[in-house]
């Protein structure tokens, strides 16, 4: 079923890791962990495991940048199988919210990326129709999507010779989300001309032409979307829905009736509680929505009524991508030390935001059920899970029936030496080290604690003739990748940033990582974070890490000890097998963003820092500070450290501005 294509055979620790993981799956182990160091080829190991067990797979990544990279790699490994991409389709997302302390209502605002919509629909179709499927997804996969049973039931099966007239087909297409139009460049539409119907699905590049002779299907052909030439003649075809959420007229009527019932119950509660303002607000808003649903079949915020459309009971989980898979699918949770906390945080973050909307009469209680899965529901809807990380968390290690280590790299590279140097004169010392790196034609990364420090240090290095750029959270993913491409090409010598882990991209040219203020305890200098930072040099034979600190914290001690443990194992393996380490040689490829026009849209669990900063224009300083503080704690709990640090810096800046205005 799966055909793995690679010019390389598994080497180093990969063969034993593959064998152990496959054996664990075959023995029915529910949870396993692949503890693989940076650069050990964890993606190749995952691909080999998938090919060996021949089962559909879902790979969950902590962010879209990493998801895009994994998607590209799996496409290379499985060119003859289906590899799909499933991330949030929002280019911009500001969720609906209410802050009662400020009496501030924030309306939902969103832009949808049509390219991602197409890729999501392709995913749903592939998962429902084939088994040789690998889906690379972000945490969006635990958010609500359409009922898979509706997706199956409402397919249109057509074969040459079938008796159906043109208008009947047009009506059926409209019922599953296709719009009639003359603009054939659009996806999810159809064109009607005489006895011919041309259909342009959202899930594939090719169009479909159905030609009729009277009320009989005369021919079915696949056509080129743009010049409309014939590509292939078919005897039969299945046309799948154009949208994720499909609503029949019967479902719509049932939903409206159910919404009315809930509204009456809730209004009765508010009246008893003496909440007159909330009573009137909810009554007016919900009746307006009902009127739109009855006349247009749609209303703004329709997703808040999803429970009524699905026929779910209060508290029942929504349908998600997980419900589309066959029951024996495997889940890989990549960078599990980040992704697992994100999966845990989604439900509570969503519910806390909606709590105010429900309590203050902006939404019915059923809005709670338009939500992501709880972590417990996620575990119930999945079967066998393999956690993948260089630094797995306590949860993964405690629940796994086996932890498989992948310490040896195929290149023979060993973990870098870690030096601790005093902070006195650290900038001058750093400059000297960067000059040495530059002379060897290599690159450096410097990680600092604040955005302001990153800017100042980068400017200082530039003044000294060292080509430097800094990474910060206000750059979107495409801009961030462009900075890293400049580093790889040699257009710049060093990149300075607050959290250089976010990308997780391969940077084989980097031989030096400098960690400034390594002894300042906090989320940016935890054991896990330090080990991940150290791993940034693990693809270069000259890799070295310098921690600037005046004391050794517990986090530093544990990170250095773990790095030295791995280094000893790697050196012994190389000595035993006569291996000479060599740097990774990796061509500068076209990035996935350029290939698929994937923009970095915020996940529904939180806005990008850029979007939050935009709110300053419409809020008072006190309101703005309340939003900053709430989002800062949320970002930190989800291990989005750079976002948390940027929000913290902005919060401090606004506080200082207020103090100055008050003359304090």
Curated annotation (Swiss-Prot):
Pfam families: Helicase_C (PF00271), ResIII (PF04851), UVR (PF02151), UvrB (PF12344), UvrB_inter (PF17757). It comes from the Bacteria. Residues 23-412 form the Helicase ATP-binding domain. SUPFAM superfamilies: C-terminal UvrC-binding domain of UvrB, P-loop containing nucleoside triphosphate hydrolases. CDD domains: DEXHc_UvrB (cd17916). GO terms for biological process: nucleotide-excision repair, DNA damage recognition; SOS response. One of its GO terms (molecular function) is ATP hydrolysis activity. ATP binds at residues 36-43. A motif (Beta-hairpin) lies at residues 89-112. Residues 622-657 form the UVR domain. Its main location: cytoplasm. Keywords: ATP-binding, Cytoplasm, DNA damage, DNA excision, DNA repair, Excision nuclease, Nucleotide-binding, SOS response. Belongs to the UvrB family. The UvrABC repair system catalyzes the recognition and processing of DNA lesions. A damage recognition complex composed of 2 UvrA and 2 UvrB subunits scans DNA for abnormalities. Upon binding of the UvrA(2)B(2) complex to a putative damaged site, the DNA wraps around one UvrB monomer. DNA wrap is dependent on ATP binding by UvrB and probably causes local melting of the DNA helix, facilitating insertion of UvrB beta-hairpin between the DNA strands. Then UvrB probes one DNA strand for the presence of a lesion. PANTHER family: UVRABC SYSTEM PROTEIN B. Forms a heterotetramer with UvrA during the search for lesions. Interacts with UvrC in an incision complex. The beta-hairpin motif is involved in DNA binding. This is UvrABC system protein B.
């Amino acid at each position: 079923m799966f055909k793995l294509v690679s010019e390389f055979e598994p080497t180093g620790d990969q063969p034993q890791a593959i064998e152990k993981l496959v054996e664990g799956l075959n023995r029915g182990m529910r949870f396993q962990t692949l503890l693989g160091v940076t650069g050990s080829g964890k993606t190749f190991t995952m691909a080999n495991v998938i090919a060996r067990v021949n089962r559909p797979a879902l790979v969950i990544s902590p962010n879209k940048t990493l998801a895009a990279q994994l998607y590209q790699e799996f496409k290379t490994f499985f060119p003859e199988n289906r590899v799909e991409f499933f991330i949030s389709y929002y280019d911009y997302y500001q969720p609906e919210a209410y802050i009662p302390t400020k009496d501030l209502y924030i309306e939902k605002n969103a832009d949808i990326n049509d390219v991602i919509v197409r890729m999501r629909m392709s995913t749903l179709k592939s998962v429902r129709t084939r088994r040789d499927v690998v889906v690379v997804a972000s945490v969006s996969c635990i958010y609500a999507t359409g009922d898979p049973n509706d997706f199956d039931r409402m397919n249109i099966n057509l074969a040459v010779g079938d008796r159906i007239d043109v208008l009947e087909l047009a009506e059926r297409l409209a019922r599953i989300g296709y719009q009639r139009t003359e603009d054939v460049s659009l996806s999810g539409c159809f064109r009607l001309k005489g006895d011919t119907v041309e259909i342009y699905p959202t899930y594939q590049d090719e169009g479909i032409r159905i030609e009729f002779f009277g009320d009989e299907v005369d021919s079915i052909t696949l056509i080129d979307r743009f010049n409309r030439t014939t590509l292939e003649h078919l005897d039969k075809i299945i046309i799948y829905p154009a949208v994720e959420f499909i609503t029949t007229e019967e479902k719509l009527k049932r939903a409206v009736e159910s919404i009315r019932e809930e509204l009456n119950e809730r209004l009765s509660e508010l009246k008893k509680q003496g909440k007159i303002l909330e009573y009137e607000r909810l009554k007016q808003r919900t009746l307006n929505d009902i009127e739109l649903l009855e006349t247009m079949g749609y209303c703004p915020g329709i997703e808040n009524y999803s429970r009524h459309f699905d026929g779910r009971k209060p508290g029942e989980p929504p349908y998600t991508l997980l419900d589309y898979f066959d029951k024996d699918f495997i889940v890989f949770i990549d960078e599990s030390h980040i992704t697992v906390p994100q999966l845990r945080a989604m439900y509570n973050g969503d519910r806390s935001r909606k709590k105010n909307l429900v309590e203050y009469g902006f939404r019915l209680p059923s809005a709670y059920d338009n939500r992501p899965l709880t972590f417990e529901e996620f575990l119930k809807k999945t079967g066998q899970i393999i956690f993948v990380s260089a630094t797995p968390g306590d949860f993964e290690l405690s629940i796994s029936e086996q932890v498989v280590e992948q310490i040896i790299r195929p290149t023979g590279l060993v973990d870098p030496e870690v030096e601790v140097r005093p902070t006195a004169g650290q900038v001058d010392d750093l400059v000297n080290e960067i000059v040495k790196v530059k002379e060897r034609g290599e690159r450096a990364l410097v990680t600092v604690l604040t955005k302001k420090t990153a800017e100042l240090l980068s400017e200082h290095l530039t003044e000294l003739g060292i080509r430097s750029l800094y990474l910060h959270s206000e750059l979107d993913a495409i801009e961030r990748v462009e900075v890293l491409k400049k580093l790889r090409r040699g257009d710049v010598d060093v990149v300075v940033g607050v959290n250089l882990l976010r990308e997780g991209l391969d940077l084989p040219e980097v031989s030096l990582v400098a960690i400034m203020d390594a002894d300042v305890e906090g989320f940016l200098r935890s054991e896990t974070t330090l080990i991940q930072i150290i791993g940034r040099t693990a693809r270069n034979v000259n890799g070295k890490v310098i921690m600037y600190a005046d004391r050794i914290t517990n986090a530093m001690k544990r990170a250095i000890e773990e790095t030295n443990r791995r280094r000893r194992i790697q050196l012994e393996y190389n000595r035993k097998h006569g291996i000479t380490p060599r740097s990774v040689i990796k061509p500068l490829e076209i990035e996935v963003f350029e290939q698929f026009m994937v923009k970095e849209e915020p996940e529904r669990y939180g806005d990008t820092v850029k979007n939050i900063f935009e709110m300053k224009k419409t809020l008072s300083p006190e309101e703005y500070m309340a939003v900053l503080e709430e989002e800062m704690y949320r970002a930190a709990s989800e291990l989005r450290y750079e976002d948390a640090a940027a929000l913290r810096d902005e919060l401090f800046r606004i506080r200082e501005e207020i103090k100055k205005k008050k003359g304090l």
